């Protein structure tokens, strides 16, 4: 019977997850298990060899909550519509939207909680050590826009099939395009999942966000493409038309709710302390993430 080290603890803070733990407590805790092929080392990381996942679920939940606290503190005027149309937590799907701001993915992820997602990101975003580590930990994978590889399609398909995470995609590919590209159609068809459209209507600039302009997230009808037998040019065009049509319908529907009415300014008495707290937590998170980025590589523990 082989005894393997499964946990090391030191310090004061915990991140719990199925295969990845930071333990910062006041004393060292040693645990041995004859059943699990696990190990730990002085770097304070626990890694379960038996299971590969697409990011750290606990860190994802933590970071999503922290970013939403910051957005709530500086804006606090977000509204979510037709959330009853979102598929159940047991179903994987592709959440698609026209990419309009830097923060619309956060609102998308928050509105669909507790569901977690993986998402594509241009490779340049991974060059920053801390931000790149954050998005990798949350399940992001890099895409080379100039020379896209087969993994850009293969990886999200495997995630949708083998895990309980869904996929966020912006079919236009960037914030400067409205054309729906074919990647989402191929992934949805091969993974046999539905496409869930959502639109963001709200401030396009940081100034507008801080001035508390209204944010509306409107969810559409899930799009089933199982009736399209072949994903040739014609099939991809049919999917693109369905997605674009739903985007246009959602934008038109949102007009009835969207206005420039701002919340009571007295709310700032609550939001300012919340923002200060969020910033302090963010600073601690940045410091800890910088240290952790030298220790833990999320790429070694993802679905292939």
Predicted regions and their residues:
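Catalytic core of membrane glycerolipid acyltransferases/transacylases, capturing the structured
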Residues: 59-60, 87-147, 155
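A conditional alpha-helix N-cap/helix-loop micro-motif detector
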Residues: 76, 146-150, 177
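A generic structural signal for well-ordered alpha-helical segments
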Residues: 71, 112, 134-135, 160, ...
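Ser/Thr/Pro/Gly-rich low-complexity, intrinsically disordered segments
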Residues: 5, 18-20, 35
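Membrane-anchoring hydrophobic helices of lipid-metabolizing enzymes
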Residues: 16-19, 24-26, 39-94, 104-106, ...
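Non-catalytic C-terminal accessory region of glycerolipid acyltransferases
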Residues: 15, 49-58, 151-304
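Acidic, Ala/Val/Gly-enriched low-complexity intrinsically disordered segments
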Residues: 2, 14, 29-31, 40
């Amino acid at each position: 019977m082989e005894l393997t080290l499964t946990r090391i603890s030191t310090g004061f803070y915990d991140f719990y997850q199925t295969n990845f733990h930071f333990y910062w407590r006041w004393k060292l805790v040693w645990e041995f298990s004859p059943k699990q092929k696990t190990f730990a080392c002085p770097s304070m990381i626990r890694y379960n060899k038996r299971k590969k996942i697409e990011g750290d679920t606990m860190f994802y939940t933590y970071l999503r909550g922290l970013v939403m606290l910051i957005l709530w503190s500086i804006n606090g005027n977000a509204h979510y519509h037709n959330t009853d149309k979102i598929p159940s937590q047991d179903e994987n799907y592709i959440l698609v939207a026209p990419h309009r701001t830097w923060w619309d993915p956060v609102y998308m992820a928050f509105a669909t909680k507790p569901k977690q997602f993986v998402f594509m990101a241009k490779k340049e975003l991974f060059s920053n050590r801390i931000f790149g580590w954050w998005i990798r930990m949350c399940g992001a994978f890099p895409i080379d826009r100039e020379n896209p590889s087969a993994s850009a399609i293969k990886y999200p398909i495997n995630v949708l099939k083998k895990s309980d995470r869904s996929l966020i995609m912006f079919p236009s590919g960037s914030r400067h395009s409205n054309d729906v590209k074919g990647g989402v159609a191929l992934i949805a068809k091969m993974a046999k999942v539905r496409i869930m459209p959502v639109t963001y209507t709200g401030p396009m600039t940081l100034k507008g966000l801080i001035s508390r302009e209204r944010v509306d997230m409107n969810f559409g009808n899930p799009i089933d493409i199982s009736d399209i037998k072949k994903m040739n040019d014609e099939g991809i065009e049919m999917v693109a038309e369905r997605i674009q049509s739903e985007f246009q319908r959602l934008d038109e529907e949102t007009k009835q709710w969207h206005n420039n009415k701002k919340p009571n300014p007295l709310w700032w008495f609550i939001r300012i302390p919340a923002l200060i707290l969020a910033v302090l937590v963010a600073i601690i998170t940045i410091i800890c993430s910088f240290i952790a980025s030298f220790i833990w590589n999320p790429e070694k523990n993802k679905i292939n």
